[in-house]
Protein backbone atom coordinates (compact mmCIF):
# COMPACT_ATOMS: atom_id res chain seq x y z
CA UNK A 1 0.00 0.00 0.00
CA UNK A 2 1.13 3.50 -0.65
CA UNK A 3 0.55 5.01 2.77
CA UNK A 4 0.98 8.55 1.50
CA UNK A 5 -1.75 8.14 -1.14
CA UNK A 6 -4.33 6.59 1.20
CA UNK A 7 -3.72 9.26 3.85
CA UNK A 8 -3.97 11.95 1.18
CA UNK A 9 -7.25 10.48 -0.12
CA UNK A 10 -8.62 10.34 3.46
CA UNK A 11 -7.62 13.92 4.28
CA UNK A 12 -9.04 15.19 0.97
CA UNK A 13 -12.50 13.74 1.62
CA UNK A 14 -12.05 10.60 -0.43
CA UNK A 15 -13.95 7.33 -0.12
CA UNK A 16 -11.63 4.43 0.68
CA UNK A 17 -12.27 0.69 0.23
CA UNK A 18 -10.28 -1.29 2.79
CA UNK A 19 -10.06 -4.69 4.52
CA UNK A 20 -11.61 -5.22 7.95
CA UNK A 21 -11.83 -8.35 10.09
CA UNK A 22 -14.22 -10.24 7.77
CA UNK A 23 -15.21 -8.16 4.74
CA UNK A 24 -14.08 -5.14 2.79
CA UNK A 25 -15.36 -1.85 4.10
CA UNK A 26 -15.99 1.56 2.65
CA UNK A 27 -15.05 4.58 4.69
CA UNK A 28 -14.02 8.19 4.91
CA UNK A 29 -13.03 10.91 7.35
CA UNK A 30 -15.76 11.03 10.04
CA UNK A 31 -15.43 14.82 10.25
CA UNK A 32 -16.03 15.47 6.55
CA UNK A 33 -19.80 15.88 6.00
CA UNK A 34 -19.49 15.96 2.21
CA UNK A 35 -17.57 12.67 2.26
CA UNK A 36 -20.20 11.16 4.59
CA UNK A 37 -23.01 12.23 2.25
CA UNK A 38 -21.15 10.82 -0.73
CA UNK A 39 -20.55 7.52 1.09
CA UNK A 40 -24.23 7.16 2.02
CA UNK A 41 -25.29 7.96 -1.54
CA UNK A 42 -22.78 5.49 -2.98
CA UNK A 43 -24.02 2.75 -0.63
CA UNK A 44 -27.67 3.69 -1.20
CA UNK A 45 -27.91 3.64 2.60
CA UNK A 46 -30.42 5.58 4.67
CA UNK A 47 -28.77 8.24 6.86
CA UNK A 48 -31.14 7.14 9.66
CA UNK A 49 -29.20 3.87 10.10
CA UNK A 50 -25.91 5.42 11.21
CA UNK A 51 -22.41 4.19 10.47
CA UNK A 52 -19.57 2.48 12.37
CA UNK A 53 -16.32 4.11 13.42
CA UNK A 54 -13.28 1.85 13.18
CA UNK A 55 -10.20 2.89 15.17
CA UNK A 56 -6.75 1.72 16.09
CA UNK A 57 -7.12 2.86 19.71
CA UNK A 58 -9.74 4.01 22.21
CA UNK A 59 -8.25 7.50 22.37
CA UNK A 60 -9.08 7.98 18.67
CA UNK A 61 -12.76 7.42 19.49
CA UNK A 62 -12.96 9.93 22.35
CA UNK A 63 -13.98 12.98 20.24
CA UNK A 64 -16.99 11.04 18.93
CA UNK A 65 -18.32 9.38 22.08
CA UNK A 66 -19.53 10.63 25.46
CA UNK A 67 -17.09 8.74 27.65
CA UNK A 68 -18.50 10.43 30.79
CA UNK A 69 -21.73 8.42 30.35
CA UNK A 70 -19.90 5.10 30.43
CA UNK A 71 -19.58 3.79 34.02
CA UNK A 72 -16.10 2.53 34.94
CA UNK A 73 -17.17 -1.14 35.15
CA UNK A 74 -18.84 -0.93 31.73
CA UNK A 75 -15.75 0.79 30.28
CA UNK A 76 -13.56 -2.07 31.51
CA UNK A 77 -15.92 -4.58 29.85
CA UNK A 78 -16.05 -2.46 26.69
CA UNK A 79 -12.26 -2.32 26.45
CA UNK A 80 -11.87 -6.04 27.23
CA UNK A 81 -13.88 -6.93 24.09
CA UNK A 82 -11.31 -5.33 21.77
CA UNK A 83 -9.68 -5.85 19.39
CA UNK A 84 -11.88 -8.82 18.60
CA UNK A 85 -14.20 -7.91 15.73
CA UNK A 86 -16.93 -6.70 18.08
CA UNK A 87 -18.73 -3.43 17.36
CA UNK A 88 -20.17 -1.71 20.40
CA UNK A 89 -22.86 0.93 20.76
CA UNK A 90 -21.77 3.69 23.15
CA UNK A 91 -23.24 7.10 24.06
CA UNK A 92 -22.41 9.58 21.33
CA UNK A 93 -20.88 13.02 21.67
CA UNK A 94 -23.79 15.31 20.80
CA UNK A 95 -21.52 17.46 18.63
CA UNK A 96 -21.02 14.73 16.00
CA UNK A 97 -22.89 14.68 12.72
CA UNK A 98 -26.17 12.77 12.66
CA UNK A 99 -24.80 11.24 9.45
CA UNK A 100 -22.53 9.18 11.76
CA UNK A 101 -25.05 8.24 14.45
CA UNK A 102 -28.22 8.15 12.40
CA UNK A 103 -31.36 8.57 14.47
CA UNK A 104 -29.72 7.13 17.60
CA UNK A 105 -28.32 8.50 20.89
CA UNK A 106 -25.46 6.04 20.51
CA UNK A 107 -22.69 5.54 17.98
CA UNK A 108 -21.30 2.21 16.79
CA UNK A 109 -17.53 1.89 17.38
CA UNK A 110 -14.89 -0.81 17.04
CA UNK A 111 -11.16 -1.07 17.67
CA UNK A 112 -9.53 -3.25 15.05
CA UNK A 113 -6.25 -5.10 14.76
CA UNK A 114 -6.34 -5.11 10.93
CA UNK A 115 -2.84 -3.67 10.30
CA UNK A 116 -3.67 -1.49 7.26
CA UNK A 117 -6.57 0.17 9.09
CA UNK A 118 -4.55 0.60 12.30
CA UNK A 119 -1.78 2.28 10.26
CA UNK A 120 -4.24 4.64 8.56
CA UNK A 121 -5.85 5.57 11.88
CA UNK A 122 -2.44 6.19 13.45
CA UNK A 123 -1.32 8.38 10.56
CA UNK A 124 -4.50 10.48 10.60
CA UNK A 125 -4.93 10.27 14.39
CA UNK A 126 -8.63 9.54 13.97
CA UNK A 127 -10.98 6.68 13.24
CA UNK A 128 -12.31 5.86 9.79
CA UNK A 129 -15.99 5.46 9.01
CA UNK A 130 -16.87 1.85 8.28
CA UNK A 131 -19.69 0.29 6.33
CA UNK A 132 -19.53 -2.89 4.29
CA UNK A 133 -18.35 -2.58 0.69
CA UNK A 134 -21.60 -3.41 -1.05
CA UNK A 135 -24.79 -1.74 -2.14
CA UNK A 136 -27.49 -1.99 0.55
CA UNK A 137 -29.03 -5.45 0.51
CA UNK A 138 -26.20 -7.14 -1.43
CA UNK A 139 -23.41 -9.39 -0.16
CA UNK A 140 -20.29 -7.52 0.98
CA UNK A 141 -16.99 -8.04 -0.83
CA UNK A 142 -14.44 -10.21 0.98
CA UNK A 143 -11.46 -9.23 -1.20
CA UNK A 144 -10.50 -6.10 -3.08
CA UNK A 145 -10.75 -8.09 -6.32
CA UNK A 146 -14.41 -8.90 -5.63
CA UNK A 147 -15.50 -5.29 -5.09
CA UNK A 148 -18.61 -4.46 -7.08
CA UNK A 149 -17.55 -2.84 -10.36
CA UNK A 150 -19.84 0.14 -9.75
CA UNK A 151 -18.41 0.69 -6.26
CA UNK A 152 -14.79 0.22 -7.28
CA UNK A 153 -15.10 2.93 -9.94
CA UNK A 154 -16.54 5.40 -7.44
CA UNK A 155 -14.07 5.04 -4.58
CA UNK A 156 -10.97 7.21 -4.47
CA UNK A 157 -8.56 4.63 -3.07
CA UNK A 158 -8.55 0.84 -2.68
CA UNK A 159 -6.32 -0.46 0.11
CA UNK A 160 -5.28 -3.79 -1.40
CA UNK A 161 -4.76 -5.62 1.87
CA UNK A 162 -6.47 -8.73 3.19
CA UNK A 163 -9.17 -9.23 5.79
CA UNK A 164 -8.34 -10.97 9.06
CA UNK A 165 -10.23 -14.05 7.84
CA UNK A 166 -13.36 -13.89 9.97
CA UNK A 167 -16.34 -15.49 8.26
CA UNK A 168 -19.11 -13.07 9.25
CA UNK A 169 -19.50 -9.33 9.85
CA UNK A 170 -18.87 -8.03 13.36
CA UNK A 171 -21.18 -8.78 16.24
CA UNK A 172 -22.86 -5.60 17.55
CA UNK A 173 -23.38 -5.20 21.30
CA UNK A 174 -24.87 -2.35 23.34
CA UNK A 175 -21.92 -1.58 25.62
CA UNK A 176 -24.09 -0.34 28.50
CA UNK A 177 -26.76 -3.06 28.56
CA UNK A 178 -24.85 -5.99 27.04
CA UNK A 179 -27.76 -6.62 24.65
CA UNK A 180 -26.67 -8.26 21.39
CA UNK A 181 -28.01 -6.23 18.46
CA UNK A 182 -26.44 -8.35 15.68
CA UNK A 183 -24.86 -11.74 16.26
UniProtKB/Swiss-Prot annotation:
Keywords: ATP-binding, Cytoplasm, Nucleotide-binding, Nucleotidyltransferase, Transferase, tRNA processing. The lineage of its organism: Bacteria, Pseudomonadati, Pseudomonadota, Gammaproteobacteria, Alteromonadales. One of its GO terms (biological process) is tRNA threonylcarbamoyladenosine modification. This is Threonylcarbamoyl-AMP synthase. It is found in: Cytoplasm. The keyword Magnesium does not apply. Residues 1-183 form the YrdC-like domain. GO terms for cellular component: cytoplasm. Its EC number is 2.7.7.87. InterPro entries: DHBP_synth_RibB-like_a/b_dom (IPR017945), Sua5-like_dom (IPR006070), TC-AMP_synthase (IPR023535), TC-AMP_synthase_SUA5 (IPR050156). One of its GO terms (molecular function) is tRNA binding. It comes from Colwellia psychrerythraea (strain 34H / ATCC BAA-681) (Vibrio psychroerythus). It catalyses: L-threonine + hydrogencarbonate + ATP = L-threonylcarbamoyladenylate + diphosphate + H2O. Belongs to the SUA5 family. TsaC subfamily.
